[in-house]
């Protein structure tokens, strides 16, 4: 388990507290709403209250140009304007009006308004401040208004960009979550024996120790769609899988109330959601694996589909060894390459 300290940045820079103390010191959330509340901000605020943490609220101005990110749409009139410090302060004040009654006096918070690409600005602020947790919605709250087509089973480009470039845990919420559920008393960890999954498990254990929770380790056996796969074979595979699951998890779970769950299925995301509902969990923890398809990197279909459909919060952790590099160069590249269509984001290993 010592090797995990070298891989998991958030645990190296910000060691997790013992039970009863603060789990998080700095929590970042992002919203594209100005005049109404966003579920991700309300959820982040509740977690900040529980941990006496600083809350960082980010709003990235909607751009009217793929070339110049300072050319934006006015949040009231919708007209194209060039942003300025005065305009950004006006937007910040409007956002503050929406949340001031919810946040004060119990939450120490900061609101930042800036032009740019949302996922890049999230990464920038996260790394400037050493953020412990990022809270996001699976899609833009204004996706339909912006003309963005939501693909069933897919998370938005902002969440995807953050997950692929940052191993700070990302909490994905589909709606505002009740305060009681945010105590994270029943946590499900999806286990596929990967390094990212190991990071997610370690993070989930620290949460369980903080909140005195029960942790469920779940593994799905892929069931081949052939008639020759007998009940005897399935039972033997189940025994072997549970043994492997215990060997993988036991070092992490020795001081945590836990249960091992193994069953067969064809689609991992459906079985994870089924297990979450059956065990009435209030958090699903997953490891993310960046993948490449036709020149484009993405976060992994199981993570996407679970995050998109889950009724409870989903926390995603990515192994640092599979993160894509980001050196804050993409924005400048797009400014200079005016022919580039920003709706197609191509990443390389360089």
Describe every region a protein language model picked out.
Residues 9-15, 20-22, 46, 50, ...:
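Gly/Ser-rich helix-loop-strand patches that form or flank binding pockets
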Residues 77-93, 233-242:
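A short acidic, glycine-rich active-site loop
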Residues 40, 68, 146-147, 183, ...:
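Short, well-ordered secondary-structure micro-motifs
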Residues 2-5, 14:
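Low-complexity, intrinsically disordered or signal/transmembrane-proximal segments
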Residues 36, 142-144, 196, 268, ...:
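Short glycine-rich, flexible loops that bind phosphorylated cofactors or substrates
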Residues 113-122, 263-271:
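Charged docking surfaces used in two-component/phosphorelay signaling
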Residues 109-111, 258-261:
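Rossmann-fold cofactor-recognition segment
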Residues 17-77, 106, 185-235, 250-254, ...:
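Small/aliphatic-rich secondary-structure junction motif
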